[in-house]
A protein has these predicted regions:
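Transmembrane alpha-helix boundary and packing residues in multipass membrane permease domains
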Residues: 1, 9-13, 49, 87-88, ...
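Transmembrane helix-bundle signature of multi-pass secondary active exporters and lipid flippases
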Residues: 1-45, 49, 113-114, 210, ...
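Membrane-helix interface/capping residues of multi-pass secondary transporters
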Residues: 12, 20-23, 133, 166, ...
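Helix-loop interface residues and adjacent transmembrane-helix termini in multi-pass membrane transporters
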Residues: 17-20, 54, 129-130, 160-163, ...
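Small-residue-rich hydrophobic transmembrane alpha-helices
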Residues: 25-76, 80, 120-129, 247-305, ...
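Hydrophobic positions within alpha-helical transmembrane segments
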Residues: 26-29, 33, 106-109, 127, ...
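Short alpha-helical transmembrane segments in multi-pass integral membrane proteins
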Residues: 51-115, 146-153, 161-217, 273-338, ...
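Alpha-helical transmembrane segments of multi-pass membrane transporters/permeases
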Residues: 126-153, 167-170, 283-296, 351-374, ...
Length: 422
């Protein structure tokens, strides 16, 4: 995800020098590619608690790794199919022919990138479950570096070599995904618990793959719900005027950047919960997740504080429009509160992942974000962006309550071990 995000940002910047139709074709494809990759990554997070449960047992761990690869193949192919269908989606949606004519092979390159990224996510999810976050970071940084270097070179060209334009962007992002996946799989093969063991997918164990999907697919559905509702919010902001639309878009980007810290902390709690889960130690499970919530809160507050202090130079990187900057500055306190609540709900959501019970998260998202989607347009029409972000804050606050309540109740079912409950 880090490599694809960095690649998308760089490609957007460099394609701005090309024809407007080219940038529009890029945006159209990314509108499908981004939720597709995020959904696949969400589905593969279901692998994490299963690998964490066997972090010291190679004989039990190896089949889980292979099952994760089969889940990656299945979800990756579905995501790739969606991205490859961008020309048909655009045609059915009434996208101008000029934009569609610029697509060329780009959707097919990005479809391949979805499948490659899925295989990489299978490895990184396994590494997270094993508590090897440094290897995950190394894989992400390798892909990011490749995207940052290759994107401008392949799109605009280097020296006497002509750029490839939009196909160059696709090649760069596919290469970055391949490098990230290769580094992740290399790191996985070097883990002591899997040393000298064949890590190919082997023969699929359908029931075991379905068990992984039972945890991962509700997570994928929550990702789709979140993307869909954020799209509704973007439309609500765009109905005001272009300045408010830009301010909203940049504010969402800022929340996404800060939110990555909460995701990292939330994922890191899963291997910490695993030993308590094995022992059916309810208190230990809850303590580990609460510690993750406190850590995520601290990380988000730290990054948010830096953002608040450096708000002027940071915003100048996103826009030179004074009106848009003023609007973002006015929203900044709300933006930071939204990130804090989003971070807390995410950690409790990962707590549910750790105990392999993710359907409650899906229900919480469906209710809270469903209400937000219904209220977004009328609230924005009456109160502008402030009302919109207050509504988002309210939805996230309800999510915190819902996720925490579900986690507390579902973790209580793990078993009673004397004084180990609270």
């Amino acid at each position: 995800m880090l490599a694809s995000t960095a690649g998308a940002l760089v490609d957007t910047a460099v394609l701005g020098r090309h024809a407007t139709a080219t940038l529009a074709a890029f945006a159209l494809t990314m509108a499908v590619y981004t939720p597709a990759t995020a959904t696949v990554a969400g589905a593969l997070r279901g692998v994490m608690p299963f690998t964490a449960a066997h972090d010291e047992d190679p004989d039990a761990l190896l089949p889980v790794v292979r099952d994760g690869l089969w889940l990656a193949i299945a979800t990756g192919l579905l995501g790739a199919l969606a991205v490859a269908g961008v020309p048909l989606i655009g045609l059915a949606s009434g996208v101008p022919h000029r934009t569609l004519s610029e697509l060329g092979v780009f959707p097919h390159l990005m479809a391949a990138a979805v499948l490659v990224a899925a295989m990489g996510n299978a490895a990184t999810s396994t590494l997270v479950g094993l508590g090897r976050s440094r290897l995950v970071m190394r894989a992400g940084m390798s892909g990011t570096a490749a995207a940052v270097v290759l994107s401008p070179a392949l799109v605009n060209g280097v020296g006497p070599l002509d750029g490839l334009g939009l196909p160059g962007a696709g090649i760069a992002m596919l290469t970055a995904a391949a490098i990230s996946a290769a580094v992740a799989h290399t790191g996985l093969r070097r883990c002591a618990v899997l040393a000298s063991r064949p890590l190919g997918p082997g023969t699929p164990r359908v029931r075991a793959v379905v068990a992984l999907a039972g945890v991962g697919l509700p997570l994928a559905a929550t990702v789709l719900i979140k993307f869909a509702v954020l799209g509704v919010l973007a439309v609500a902001a765009a109905r005001i005027d272009p300045v408010h639309a830009a301010a909203h878009s940049i504010s969402v980007s800022l929340t996404g950047l800060v939110f990555t810290a909460a995701v990292a902390v939330g994922q890191a709690t899963i291997p910490l919960v695993a030993p308590h889960l094995k022992a059916k130690d309810v208190r230990g499970v809850r303590t580990a997740v609460r510690a993750g919530a406190v850590t995520a809160l601290g990380a988000v507050l730290l990054i948010g504080g830096v953002l608040a202090v450096l708000r002027v130079p940071v915003l100048s990187l996103f826009t030179h429009d004074a009106a848009a900057r003023d609007q973002i500055l006015a929203l900044l306190p709300l933006v930071l509160l939204v990130v804090v609540t989003d971070a807390l709900q995410a950690v409790f959501g990962f707590g549910l992942v750790a105990i392999r019970d993710t359907v409650p998260s899906l229900l919480a998202f469906a209710v809270c974000y469903g209400l937000l989607a219904l209220a977004a347009v009328p609230l924005t029409a009456r109160g502008g962006l402030t009302a919109l972000w207050l509504a988002l804050l309210g939805a996230n606050t309800l999510l915190v309550v819902g996720q925490a309540t579900f986690f507390h109740r579902r973790s209580g079912r793990l078993g009673v071990s004397g004084p180990g409950t609270d």
